[in-house]
Amino acid sequence: MLQVYNTLTRNKETFKPLKEGEVSIYACGPTVYNMPHIGNYRTFLLADTVVRTLQYLGYKVKLVMNITDIDDKTIRDSKAAGMSLKDFTDKYSAEFFKGLDMLNIKRASAYPRATENVDGMIELAQKLIEKGLAYEKGGSVYYRISGFPDYGKLSKLDFDSIRIGASVDVDEYDKDNPRDFALLKASAPEEIERSIYYESPWGKIRPGWHIECSVMAMNSFGPTLDVHIGGVDLIFPHHENEIAQSEGATGIPFVRHWIHGEHLIVEGEKMSKSKGNVFTLPEIVEMYGGEVVRFMFLSVHYRKKLDYSETFAENAKNNYLKLKETLDNLEFALKNVEDEPGPGDLETLKTLPELENRFREALEDDFNTPKAITVFRELSRTANVYLETGKNMQVLEEIHALYKRFSDTLGIFAKAGGEEVPGEVVRLVEEREEARKIKDWKTSDAIREKIKSLGYIVQDTKEGPKIKKSEES
């Protein structure tokens, strides 16, 4: 039974969606004003991990991830770049999607944009004013946090010293010292000049950051959703404010399960431009490959800080390559096996369900991917032991099927077994075999090097030559 740590209660809870067998998930997506760094993608990968796990457990899942394409940062940086807000945010939205593909992150069911949902934000602000939970001031609309007694229930911060009635326009304000926050902001003259405004009962406005997610989540799922995902940095003020807005308007719980991923740090320190330790995803992928980066993220539980370093990344790469080599060996054996029964067949078949039970139990324990990877490595060892002597087609097929279930659930080896070896490489391997038969080792070695230059390597096995793509290519 799936147990999920709920930030709201600070406890692991038995997961129960509103509708049996179906799960609604809203995840905070990118603010598209620059290249997302690797910490952002750790959170996006968390959403993908939750989706894949739930699907593995038999749930039908709908994930919605927003794109914040209008806020303080996008307006500021688009102006600095000399671009329209739309052209600027479209550019970085495209970069965001490229990053998802690099990490083999499944597409969400929808990616609503803030600019496409402003009418709903104006309606929500009107409703909150009618309930006495919001007020207009200077053409902006603010949330009155003193009117919502449950304010602070998610972040568990001490709000005894809240300054009642003080209001701020910034999207990100001082931690531990909240103010009435802006739902809708009066557009500044320079924003109006750039056509960054929407007509409202209070004049020309543009949305604040927090109201965007409340509206997009409720537009997608109604007043209550099963799961809301984001980074720990969003607990306060962003998610606290989402609760205040949504529950203030509807009077019913907004989210059943809050899931928050921890920070990614670099060699023990928080990423910052001043320290020069901010890495974008393309930079890291260029060094290690997308699947290795994904595997690296999965090797640390989402509620623990991930301390990125070159040593840590290299260790993840080595473990990933060992698992991939086993898959390559399995697929090679399936194509070349003689299909003979052996003494280890029954014992191996008996082991597989036990391993799958442990894999499932790991993921049911609050999406414990490091523990699931440990079980995956045990399956790899089991497979390699069998491959030394076993030749039973049924056993090999069952090992391979379980291996693929594990890898698909973790989202790795997406391209394994699907790439055709170029005809030129196949021809060179055949020529090399002819040279080896007559013990012409010089020619054999020369052909091996030529094959390597084409991005492939040859492994000589007792079943014959095995071709695989070089990890360096």
UniProtKB/Swiss-Prot annotation:
Catalyzed reactions: tRNA(Cys) + L-cysteine + ATP = L-cysteinyl-tRNA(Cys) + AMP + diphosphate
Cofactor binding description: Binds 1 zinc ion per subunit.
Key words, A-Z: Aminoacyl-tRNA synthetase, ATP-binding, Cytoplasm, Ligase, Metal-binding, Nucleotide-binding, Protein biosynthesis, Zinc
Xref: Pfam families: CysS_C, DALR_2, tRNA-synt_1e
Subcellular location per the Swiss-Prot or TrEMBL entry: Cytoplasm
A GO term for molecular function: zinc ion binding
Names of the cofactor(s): Zn(2+)
Family named by the database record: Belongs to the class-I aminoacyl-tRNA synthetase family.
Protein name: Cysteine--tRNA ligase
Organism: Methanosarcina mazei (strain ATCC BAA-159 / DSM 3647 / Goe1 / Go1 / JCM 11833 / OCM 88) (Methanosarcina frisia)
